[in-house]
Curated annotation (Swiss-Prot):
It is found in: Secreted. This is UPF0669 protein C6orf120 homolog. Pfam families: UPF0669. It comes from Rattus norvegicus. GO terms for biological process: apoptotic process.
Amino acid sequence: MATPWRCALLMILASQVVILVKCLEDDDVPEEWLLLHVVQGQIGAGNYSYLRLNHEGKIILRMQSLRGDADLYVSDSTPHPSFDEYELQSVTCGQDVVSIPAHFQRPVGIGIYGHPSHHESDFEMRVYYDRTVDQYPFGEAAYAADQTGTSQKQAYTPEEAAQEEESVLWTILISILKLVLEILF
């Protein structure tokens, strides 16, 4: 009788180990992201640590709280962003991700806040440069530093977008009409 319980317990333990290993692995990042920096630090409860970002372009900040809970605040208008004054934030219990647009004025202020629920928080922040192409509503495309044209996306014009919407509507309408005809006949 103890054997089935032992097997069940081993299965539960094995699944917990697999989940733990997956959590500890680095998350996959897109190929378009180029790792620029890795910053590790420790912050006390209720305190801020400030960093300054000078890199141009679209930047991704991925911060993992290794112990405790560190939160992320970003601003292009103040060098010392806080929970009262910021443009972008991520305040999760775990991994915090903020995407800083290319149009933000440099230098960008980064504030890391140690949540009061923990005496101290350890964090690791990875700074990535996003090399993907941004699409603009007026048909302009801003391309990354790679100007070879190998991975450039073409911007849609308003006429193409209208034609695509019209095509989708016609497809839906014809499908509904076929369904009605099939039911009737």
